[in-house]
Amino acid sequence: MTFGEYIEEKRKSKKITLRGLAEKLGIAPSYMSDIEKGKRNPNRKELIDNIAKVLNLTQEEHNELYDLSAQQNENDISVDLTEYIMNDKVARTALRTARDFNATEEEWNAFIQTLKGNR
């Protein structure tokens, strides 16, 4: 599923028209249409956050929106992660170490559970 298809699906499930969503976001309906058709990709965090807010997405759905946006722009990192990664040397080191040692999904899940358990 593409970024635009995901937005369209969520918008329709909430019974919001394309024009209605565009108005709530303060953008032109033609721009919103281009986003849904995959002709344009709003990789600005603010717009993605506003889309998630207007569509009342869960945190998991919001994260999926970030990831789909990054996938549409090949080689991009999700806009919600870019600033964090670039401002945290340890995060960059951890990611590079995981890459170099080919960390498995199981290892990543164990790491996530360890972090959650410490909170």
Regions found by a protein language model. Name each.
Residues 1-14, 106-114:
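A short, Lys/Arg-rich alpha-helix, primarily the initiator
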Residues 7, 21-22, 32-35:
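Conserved hydrophobic/aromatic packing and binding residues within compact polymer-binding modules
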Residues 19-22, 51:
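Short alpha-helical "recognition helix" segments of helix-turn-helix
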Residues 26-42, 50:
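Recognition helix of helix-turn-helix/homeodomain-like DNA-binding domains
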Residues 46-64:
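DNA major-groove recognition helix of helix-turn-helix/homeodomain DNA-binding modules
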Residues 70-119:
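Interfacial/linker helices and their anchor residues that mediate assembly or domain coupling
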